[in-house]
Regions:
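Hydrophobic, Leu/Ile/Phe/Ala-enriched alpha-helical segments that form helix-helix packing faces
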Residues: 27, 68, 72-80, 172
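Metal-dependent catalytic neighborhoods of phosphoester/phosphodiester hydrolases
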Residues: 16, 40-75, 93-98, 191-201
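A short beta-strand submotif of the Rossmann-like class I SAM-dependent methyltransferase core
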Residues: 37
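A short alpha-helix capping/helix-coil boundary motif
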Residues: 2-4, 49-53, 79-80
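Active-site regions of metal-assisted phosphoester/phosphodiester hydrolases
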Residues: 1-34, 82-292
Length: 292
């Protein structure tokens, strides 16, 4: 099974439609089964779509005609591929977008779980974050695919990442009672920092799939200065795919490298090939206590 995660930076990119089509062609050419997306934007002012193509739900806001995930699903459909999709809103971005996370799957989606990681913040506050999990059916069983876009470790003196991950870990631990969990996303926390977000996630028992991979291609996912990392020009690994238990990871590759002509976002993507029949029977995830 092939899995892709990407922070799309949608509608903040030039040539956005062309980049959507590039991604759709890649998904088909690489036979990607499940895709976790972040920064899936739509303008709040554009027309609502009454019956979005292949949409399975998950959002508290309506889908608009310029929704990035909808346009991607439509492009895939035009190319002959059918993908179901889900959506969960996080907050208002740049004063004009519904910023969301989404999951696309060519395998059946059997359940959807929106995860509010910031109940103390309102929808118009950038501090509000949400994740989503979708129960995916494979030939050998089901697993939960989750997508998230975390806050920075320190947000104006507030430990937002730790608070968010505590709630996320609790929700994913509930998911893990019924099926394995695969979590992809933009964690806004560099892997080399030993006392920040990456360390917190792995301390809960989540396994970095790159460490399990038989073959790896690339490591860092951001190679230049981006929004939220102003003044930081060093290459860093801030996008990850974690699993709640051991499994066979055949390959783990950085794709659409952000510092290459193939870039379609200000983040690189991660493409994994895993064996969905290889999940260990026991989850390693121990949920964390909510920080105050």
């Amino acid at each position: 099974m092939r899995f892709l995660t990407l922070n799309t930076h949608s509608w903040c990119e030039i040539h956005q439609i062309a980049k959507i089509r590039t991604l759709a062609k890649f998904i088909i050419d690489q036979q990607v089964d499940v895709i976790a997306l972040q920064e899936v934007n739509q303008l709040t002012s554009t027309p609502v779509v009454k019956e979005p193509l292949n949409y399975r739900g998950g959002a508290g806001v309506p889908v608009h005609e310029d929704n990035y995930a909808l346009l991607l699903v439509q492009a895939l459909n035009e190319m002959g591929a059918t993908y179901e999709w889900t959506l969960t809103e996080t907050h208002i971005g740049w004063d004009r977008y519904d910023e969301c996370v989404a999951i696309l799957s060519r395998l059946p989606i059997r359940g959807i779980k929106p995860i509010d990681m910031s109940p103390e913040y309102g929808y118009h506050q950038v501090q509000r974050r949400a994740a989503q999990a979708a129960l995916i059916e494979t030939e050998t069983g089901t697993f939960w695919c989750a997508t998230t876009h975390m806050s920075w470790w320190d947000f104006d003196g507030e430990p937002l990442f730790a608070q968010e991950y505590a709630r996320l870990s609790q929700a994913l631990a509930d998911c893990a009672l019924t099926a394995p969990v695969l979590l992809g996303g933009d964690f806004n926390s560099a892997a080399h920092l030993s006392d920040e977000g990456y360390a917190l996630v792995t301390s809960s028992g989540m396994v970095d799939t790159r460490s399990l991979a038989e073959h790896t291609d690339g490591e860092n996912t951001v190679h230049r200065e981006i929004a939220g990392w102003e003044g930081s020009t060093d290459a860093k690994r801030i996008d990850f795919v974690f699993a709640d238990r051991l499994l066979t990871v055949n390959s783990h590759a950085v794709v659409f490298r952000d510092n290459s002509p193939e870039a379609i976002s200000d983040h690189s993507g991660l493409l994994l090939e895993i064996d969905p029949s290889s999940w260990a029977p026991q989850s390693l995830l121990t949920p964390l206590t909510t920080q105050h």
